[in-house]
Amino acid sequence: MAISSSTSGTSSSFPSRTTVMLLLFFFAASVGITDAQVGVCYGMQGNNLPPVSEVIALYKKSNITRMRIYDPNRAVLEALRGSNIELILGVPNSDLQSLTNPSNAKSWVQKNVRGFWSSVLFRYIAVGNEISPVNRGTAWLAQFVLPAMRNIHDAIRSAGLQDQIKVSTAIDLTLVGNSYPPSAGAFRDDVRSYLDPIIGFLSSIRSPLLANIYPYFTYAYNPRDISLPYALFTSPSVVVWDGQRGYKNLFDATLDALYSALERASGGSLEVVVSESGWPSAGAFAATFDNGRTYLSNLIQHVKGGTPKRPNRAIETYLFAMFDENKKQPEVEKHFGLFFPNKWQKYNLNFSAEKNWDISTEHNATILFLKSDM
């Protein structure tokens, strides 16, 4: 369509410079300039962690605009008021049975969500973390997850917040029985009766599935068949071909296997939020400072671009975790922090948030990146 220019008083087929700039601005906005895609999980299993107020200040100082917490800690919620930090709020596994009672779920939402909205920006409610019907430690809780999810969602809807706050649950990848090649990804047969109804519910309310994805553990359990560069995003060439799709890193292969598993469970429309991912700096095989820094910095740059199966779609991702936590077990679990408890950056990395105005791509977003200044 021709745009008239008034500079000469006659019609022209060429737009003015001002018009072009305006069009570029609105086009850039239309293709997805959004908040940073990367957040950081705030675990609190340490006896030497900074006061909550200092932690929130550190998030803000570091331009980390999204957070995940694992229970409705009152001090954290109070400190988040007015911070503009978007939050994944966890429902502890220990609360699941109680929340199968609709009245209890309504009270939980009233106390922990309504009481803080909208000065706290709740993004998701994660109802349970890594529940598995085939894990002896959590199997007895599996029966409570979906009823609790339904009741929390109903309470959120009764509050009129269903469009602002989505309800989900966080899984780990042990529920995926086959992951190679990624297109053959499928959930274990013995978890389908648990997981399929959850997938159906998430699809019906248009909520994403939360998934904790750790290439570190996959590599550490099988270093003979998986190369370290493939796990760290440093492979210079394709490692795995899956039809026409080439995989240069384990993260993409893992996530695409999950997408394939969801398709086989009638959940192909679901988005996946990577609710945890990280690499330890000590405590076990391949857990080193250099590997941690390499993985995290590459992950943050990588997730703005999607996977081979779902390209050009930023992947909302939460790094695990903000601090080393000295009360966790086993030893390796103590060393996932991006910061030491004294608030020093473990990797001497510089967090920054900036707009990406490259309109040549379809996935423009505000990118939170890690840049080493070592």
From Swiss-Prot:
Q: How is it modified after translation?
A: Glycosylated in cv. GT.1 and cv. RRIM 600 but not in cv. PR 261. Asn-350 is glycosylated only in cv. GT.1 due to the presence of Ser-352. In cv. PR 261 and cv. RRIM 600, Ser-352 is replaced by Gly so Asn-350 is not glycosylated. In cv. GT.1, four different forms of the enzyme have been detected with differently processed C-termini. In cv. PR 261 and cv. RRIM 600, only 2 forms are detected, a major form which is processed at residue 352 and a minor form which is processed at residue 354.
- Record: active site: E130, E276
Keywords for this entry? Allergen, Glycoprotein, Glycosidase, Hydrolase, Plant defense, Pyrrolidone carboxylic acid, Signal, Vacuole
Q: Which residues form the propeptide?
A: 357-374
Identify the tissues in which this protein is expressed.
Expressed at highest levels in laticifer cells of the petiole.
Q: What is its main location?
A: other
Q: Give the signal sequence positions.
A: 1-36
Domain of life, per UniProt, equals Eukaryota
Q: Which GO terms describe its cellular component?
A: vacuole
UniProt GO molecular function: glucan endo-1,3-beta-D-glucosidase activity
What is this protein's name? Glucan endo-1,3-beta-glucosidase, basic vacuolar isoform
**Which species is this UniProt entry from?**
Hevea brasiliensis (Para rubber tree)
GN (gene name): HGN1
